[in-house]
Each structure stands twice: as structure tokens, then as C-alpha cells.
């Protein structure tokens, strides 16, 4: 990524943040890919641009449900033209918010770590679920299953709703849960009309200077969500998803021990991954 005239204040797994002033920052989505909490050496070309377009689409589509982190400024308002030209498709000007210290995960279907929990205990994050649900089965209602927010490189840990209340307070926990479920329901209903099932997703929220709950970071992208195609969906299976699953599957089969450094990912696996991200963008926004 090119050096910018702005001061970098944070570097995450995928996004970098730059200071504009005390109220705004520039958020830049890179082409970095993380799998199993390790950042891979091989970037996924155009991934940052595709993620930014998908996020921007959802932020606008869901703006009637709650406020979001956009300031209304363009990258050209805050960067020299040469820098803005380079980053215009992968950067956004956002409000500086106070992040809420949990990951807000909503699940509409049974898979992943939720499936493992359910098979062992009949619950997910302490929530009782009906007996007899199968892998990829639709849950009776979407559920809010928060996790703790850990540092880059550490695994986030699933927590109960009671633990969520203890971490952020009862009132805010209820606000976050209700907002996350409302956002998921609206997005899932829309995506279904485009041939995409949103299995689960992770939202990030912050508070603005007035204490207003605000949607931030990225929204309903293949990085923060599991998307399945309606065409290949089948209960009782593990449906293929529109995301980095190709890379994860390849890494699983490579014998890698999931500790840095990660092995070099073959070009054809990277190409298939780019195609999946692009397909998700095309289906959702056309």
C-alpha cells in the first residue's frame, strides 16, 4: 500500500486507519487476507475495492435502521489528488467513534462454531435451541451470539448474553442485540431475492460523541459473513460459500499448523477466491 500524507493510527488484519482530525479518520481496505487469525503473505488482488463497494452498498441500504460511520466527505476532500486517485475505490472517510468492545454476531443458520456448540450442548452461547436441527439448517429465528473482541492475532471467544451485559452494560447490550438482529433480518430478506443466503454475519458498532449507537467498520461482506448460493444450498451439508473458504480449505489440506508464517497459496486458489468475492458483489448490487 502506498505511503499516505496522513498519519497511520491503526493497522488491522485487513484495514488501516489514518488520522484526519479529532472527529474523522480515513479507513483503507487492503488486499490482505487473514485465515485462522494469521495474515497471509499473498494478497488477493482487488479484494479491498470489492469489500469497500459491498460495504458501501449495505451502509446505504440499511441507513433507515440506524446511523452509520460515514461523514459525507469524499477521499478527495482529505487527500492530495494523486493519493485519492490511488485509493478512491478502497477508502472511506469515517467518524471517529468509541468502539463497543464485543463482536456482534447474528446467526440465521446452523454451521461453524455454532454447530459444534449445538452438537455438544444443544445450545449456542448459552441459548437453548430446539432438538433435531441439522448442519446448515435454518434456525427458527435469527440469534445474537456475541464474542469477545481480542487483539489482532488472538482468537475471539464466544460469550453468553449475560457476559455481554457484564462487559458493556444491560441497556447497551439490549440495544446492540436488537440492532444487529434487525439489520440481519432486513439484509437476509433482500439477499435472498438475489440468490444469496446470509448464513451468519458479524457487525461492529460504536458510540458517537452523543452516545448514539452507530454501525461501523464493514457490513455484510464475504469477510464478515458467510454467504451461500441458493442454488447449492442443502440442509445436512456444508454448502460452499462466497468467501475465503477456498483458501481456508487449501490451507487445511496443506498440513500447515496454523502458526505464522503461512505457506504460499497457489495462484489458482487466489484466482478462484477473487472470482467468488466479485460474484458476491455482482449478485448483491445488480
Swiss-Prot record:
The keyword ATP-binding applies. It is an enzyme of class 6 (ligase). It comes from the Bacteria. Its EC number is 6.3.2.6. The keyword ATP-binding applies. Keywords: ATP-binding, Ligase, Nucleotide-binding, Purine biosynthesis. Pathway: Purine metabolism; IMP biosynthesis via de novo pathway; 5-amino-1-(5-phospho-D-ribosyl)imidazole-4-carboxamide from 5-amino-1-(5-phospho-D-ribosyl)imidazole-4-carboxylate: step 1/2. GO terms for cellular component: cytoplasm. It catalyses: 5-amino-1-(5-phospho-D-ribosyl)imidazole-4-carboxylate + L-aspartate + ATP = (2S)-2-[5-amino-1-(5-phospho-beta-D-ribosyl)imidazole-4-carboxamido]succinate + ADP + phosphate + 2 H(+). GO terms for molecular function: ATP binding; phosphoribosylaminoimidazolesuccinocarboxamide synthase activity. InterPro entries: SAICAR_synt/ADE2_N, SAICAR_synth, SAICAR_synthetase_CS. One of its GO terms (biological process) is 'de novo' IMP biosynthetic process. Belongs to the SAICAR synthetase family. PANTHER family: PHOSPHORIBOSYLAMINOIMIDAZOLE-SUCCINOCARBOXAMIDE SYNTHASE. HAMAP family: SAICAR_synth. This is Phosphoribosylaminoimidazole-succinocarboxamide synthase. It comes from Actinobacillus succinogenes (strain ATCC 55618 / DSM 22257 / CCUG 43843 / 130Z).
Amino acid at each position: 500500500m502506498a505511503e499516505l500524507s496522513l498519519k497511520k493510527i491503526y493497522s488491522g488484519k485487513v484495514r488501516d486507519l489514518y488520522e484526519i482530525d479529532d472527529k474523522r479518520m480515513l479507513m483503507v481496505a487492503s488486499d490482505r487476507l487473514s485465515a485462522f487469525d494469521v495474515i497471509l503473505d499473498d494478497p488477493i488482488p482487488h479484494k479491498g475495492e470489492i469489500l469497500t463497494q459491498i460495504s458501501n452498498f449495505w451502509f446505504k441500504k440499511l441507513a433507515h435502521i440506524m446511523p452509520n460511520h460515514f461523514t459525507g466527505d469524499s477521499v478527495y476532500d482529505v487527500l492530495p489528488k494523486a493519493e485519492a486517485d490511488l485509493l478512491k475505490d478502497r477508502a472511506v472517510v469515517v467518524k471517529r467513534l468509541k468502539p463497543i468492545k464485543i463482536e456482534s454476531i447474528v446467526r440465521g443458520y446452523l454451521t461453524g462454531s455454532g454447530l459444534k456448540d449445538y452438537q455438544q450442548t444443544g445450545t449456542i452461547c448459552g441459548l437453548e435451541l430446539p432438538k433435531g436441527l441439522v448442519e446448515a439448517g435454518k434456525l427458527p429465528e435469527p440469534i445474537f451470539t456475541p464474542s469477545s473482541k481480542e487483539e489482532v492475532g488472538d482468537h475471539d471467544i464466544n460469550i453468553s448474553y449475560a457476559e455481554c451485559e457484564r462487559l458493556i452494560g444491560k441497556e447497551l447490550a439490549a440495544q446492540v442485540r436488537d440492532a444487529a438482529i434487525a439489520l440481519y433480518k432486513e439484509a437476509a430478506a433482500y439477499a435472498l431475492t438475489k440468490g444469496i443466503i446470509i448464513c451468519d454475519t458479524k457487525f461492529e458498532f460504536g458510540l458517537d460523541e452523543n452516545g448514539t449507537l452507530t454501525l461501523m467498520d464493514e457490513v455484510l461482506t464475504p469477510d464478515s459473513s458467510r454467504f451461500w448460493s441458493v442454488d447449492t444450498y442443502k440442509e445436512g451439508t456444508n454448502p460452499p460459500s462466497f468467501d475465503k473458504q477456498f483458501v481456508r480449505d487449501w490451507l487445511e489440506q496443506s498440513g500447515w499448523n496454523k502458526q505464522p508464517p503461512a505457506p504460499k497459496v497457489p495462484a489458482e486458489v487466489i484466482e478462484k477466491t477473487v472470482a467468488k468475492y466479485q460474484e458476491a458483489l455482482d449478485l448483491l448490487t445488480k
